[in-house]
Amino acid sequence: MLQPRSDRHRAAAGVVTALLLLLVGLSPLSQSSHAQGMTTLTFLGPDFDEWVAFVKVANQIGKPMGIQVKPDYLPWDDVFQKALIDSKSGVRTWDYVYVYNTWVPGLSAAKAILPINDFMTSPAATSAVQPNDFITLTTAGLELNGKLWAMPMLAAPYMMAYRTDLFANPIEKKAFQAKYGYPLALPQTYKQLMDVAQFFTRKAGEKLMGKTLDQDFYGVVLANKSGGFLFHRYEHILVAYGANLIYDPKTMQPTVNSPQGIAAAKYYVALHKYMEPGSESLTGGGAERIMASGRGAIAMDALDNMLSVLPVAKLSKVVGKINYALLPTQLASRPHANVGDANGLAIYALTQHRDAAFKLATAVLNTQGTKQVMKEYPALVPMRASVIHDPEVRTNYAPVFNAMSTFLNGKPYTVFIPPLKEWVQAQDIYEQAMSAAMSGQQSVEDALNGAQAKVVALFKRQGYIK
């Protein structure tokens, strides 16, 4: 059969190229076989260790499929805006986009990402996703309007990590009992957390467990950097105090300065006195390094942040001295209140490789693929029941299994970010107010009243309220 003209020109060019390569002693096969027939998928995401691990495993699994992943890493808080701007501008560069659960409303409303359900058009495709295997307490944040918007990758339940040696020390137990009138124990309420944080906050030169400290010691360690880190720690206390997350979904009325919101903010500002100085500049990883250095009694953070540092011998001085527990309780009706936190892999709406993107995503984030990612990033908190209960995971990743068992068996009161496409904007307003209150620039009331007015204005512009 006669080749089309363009193909013949390419064939002729190929012969000439081969002859030239032979003349200079090069093999055309050695120069092109790696790229030949490979589909390259581009990934827009943060350079977090778990996503570096994902890319590595994706390229291992994808190689025999003829698929490779090329990452483009940005700072975490820039990924959301980049995905929004590029999708609105018609940029077709991306195939995958990292998604944090609070971004789902905005990205889905902007049609920047595709629901995974769009690909589940056959029994085989549905089987590849394994939706019934997901732990809904962890994955619900990636769902909206009955659709799953990203392949679940990493659960990030917020928990406490605490120094078991401190709480068991007889000197500290005796001193705590004398000062507060009840036994020293892991805090079950936020009042107890405040007491414990105050008690363990010490200056260099004071004693801890009978030994003189050469550095300051902090009762509680938290990351309070703006850009989401502060709000994602504070929101659990906000919910614990009975408040809505920024607004009432039933009425769409902002509730930033509600009595419950004011009480929660006052508590957090008071707790801030017992945190490490400079917490306003710290992300989760930075805060955990303070805890790992042996200078904190309790950390409150996403479980994977803590697991990626505290049990790691080359990073931590407290290996073998840490245990994990649910967050405290403020209201009996909201035990161990927790805001669902999830990270996933979304398929970019303008991808030019829909089928390949779906095929590789499901291969990497199925049961076996997730276990491979855990080998590269042992702190990964999986979102599949089949992985959590896998005998190999129980044995080789005992800290992950034990902590997640505590979380799931404890059945914390869990809420998820409401479906508001302007969520990130509203969150930033609230976070700025909290920063002002924590720094002493404004009173809690003034800061939250100002934030309330700004969120009301935002909601009016969007037509949610009059």
Language-model segment annotations:
Residues 117-133, 174-186, 212-213, 220-227, ...:
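Short, solvent-exposed loop/beta-turn-alpha elements that line the ligand-binding surface or hinge
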Residues 319-329, 375-432, 436, 461-466:
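Long, aromatic- and glycine/proline-rich binding clefts that accommodate carbohydrate-like moieties
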Residues 55-56, 77-115, 128-150, 160, ...:
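Pocket-flanking alpha-helical
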Residues 143-154, 158, 185-253, 296:
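Extracytoplasmic/periplasmic solute-binding protein
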Residues 192-201, 236-281, 323, 327:
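Glycine-centered hinge/linker elements that transmit conformational signals in sensory
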Residues 64-65, 88, 166, 262, ...:
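Extracytoplasmic/periplasmic substrate-recognition and gating elements
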Residues 2-5, 14, 26-112, 121-131, ...:
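Conserved N-terminal structural module of periplasmic/extracytoplasmic solute-binding proteins
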Residues 101-159, 168, 191, 210-216, ...:
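Hinge/lid segment of periplasmic solute-binding proteins
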